[in-house]
């Protein structure tokens, strides 16, 4: 046998072994998913930030699977509107106001949900806050606020429900991070800092809790059509910032509908997936960033130059709903504006 033939044969065997290993890994993954499949019928699901946006869409999606729903938010009026929305769909939900950045308030929330339903089977940490503007307009207080909401609040809720879940050796936790918790963006620096912290916390919690059969899923959404830009905060040239952000949030190529996203998140929770990145465009960004981090950083730096520069109201901030312009609302934001009505963002 010539050297060339021996090399060809060795190469073929190598490819066969690699294919066999890959096939075995896929089969093992499918078997593990099947073993972990979680029946949501009758389960109690607590959703933070559940009064509007993605949180409200998740409440509807979990209820569709037969779960019993509890939601919390800061604004009691928003909670009442959310309960009315769910009731109109035949869904009974418990709702209560809570400041998640206060640990005592979180513990009170968990006691109230247990008093109503007897237990908590699934925790969804969804509450969040978006701050948009150039780096120069952001203050230390903005970073502290983001960490309180995106890191400390989820930590408090997890610590409050974990003793019960670990005793039962059963439970699910879904942490809604962001593609901004994988790739940092210049005009979202406090937000991304908080979401990076949540991603790290969530991944570490999964590793720590698998032995107790408490399964943690980290969700990293990109742009979702929930209408949430109306309730985000904008700094600097706030009208221009709101325009680019709300238009991006409305474009079908870049964004995903909230109901579809919620269904995928519920499926990931049931299967016990480690991570879910949605939509497809966000998966592409995360993959490129993992393979070529320098390239992605340079691309984002180039994008920064096309975004609004410092000025306007400076480090003061204004809600998106008060930052309209000729570009937003407009036909370019039609999908996002319609979503805001459906998901209680108005």
Cite the ranges covered by each PLM segment:
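Substrate-binding pocket helix/loop in short-chain dehydrogenase/reductase
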Residues: 134-135, 142-144
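Active-site helix of classical SDR
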Residues: 158, 194
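SDR active-site lid
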Residues: 211-282, 287-291, 297-307
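The beta1-alpha1 cofactor-binding region of Rossmann-like NAD(H)/NADP(H)-dependent oxidoreductases
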Residues: 76-77, 97-108, 140
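Residue(s) in the substrate-gating loop at a strand-loop-helix junction
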Residues: 178
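Conserved glycine-rich cofactor-binding loop
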Residues: 44, 51-52
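Conserved glycine-rich Rossmann-like NAD(P)H-binding loop of the short-chain dehydrogenase/reductase
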Residues: 65-81
């Amino acid at each position: 046998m010539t050297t060339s033939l021996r090399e060809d044969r060795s190469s073929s065997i190598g490819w066969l072994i690699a294919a066999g290993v890959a096939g075995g890994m896929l089969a093992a993954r499918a078997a593990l998913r099947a073993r972990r499949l979680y029946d949501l019928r009758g389960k109690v699901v607590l959703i933070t930030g559940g009064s509007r946006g993605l949180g409200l869409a998740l409440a509807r999606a979990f209820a569709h699977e037969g779960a019993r729903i509890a939601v919390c938010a800061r604004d009691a009026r928003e909670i009442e509107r959310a309960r009315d929305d769910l009731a109109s769909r035949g869904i009974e939900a418990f709702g209560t106001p809570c400041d998640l950045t206060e640990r005592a308030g979180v513990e009170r929330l968990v006691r109230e949900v247990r008093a109503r339903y007897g237990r908590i089977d699934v925790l969804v940490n969804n509450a969040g806050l978006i701050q948009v503007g150039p780096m120069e307009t952001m203050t230390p207080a903005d970073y502290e606020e983001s960490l309180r909401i995106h890191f400390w609040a989820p930590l408090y809720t997890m610590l409050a429900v974990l003793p019960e879940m670990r005793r039962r050796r059963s439970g699910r936790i879904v942490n809604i991070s962001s593609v901004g918790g994988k790739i940092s963006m210049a005009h979202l620096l406090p937000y991304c800092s908080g979401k990076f912290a949540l991603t790290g916390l969530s991944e570490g919690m999964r590793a720590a809790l698998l032995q107790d059969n408490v399964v943690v899923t980290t969700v990293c959404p990109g742009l979702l059509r929930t209408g949430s830009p109306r309730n985000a905060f904008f700094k600097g040239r706030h009208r221009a910032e709101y325009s680019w952000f709300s238009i991006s949030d409305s474009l079908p190529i870049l964004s995903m509908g909230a109901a579809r996203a919620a269904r995928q998140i519920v499926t990931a929770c049931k299967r016990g997936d480690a991570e879910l990145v949605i939509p497809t465009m966000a998966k592409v960004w995360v993959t490129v960033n993992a393979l070529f981090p320098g390239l992605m950083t340079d691309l984002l730096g180039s994008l920064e130059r096309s975004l609004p520069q410092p000025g306007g109201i400076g480090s003061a901030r204004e809600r998106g709903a008060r930052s309209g312009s000729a570009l937003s609302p407009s036909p370019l934001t039609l999908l996002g504006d319609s979503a805001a009505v459906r998901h209680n963002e108005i």
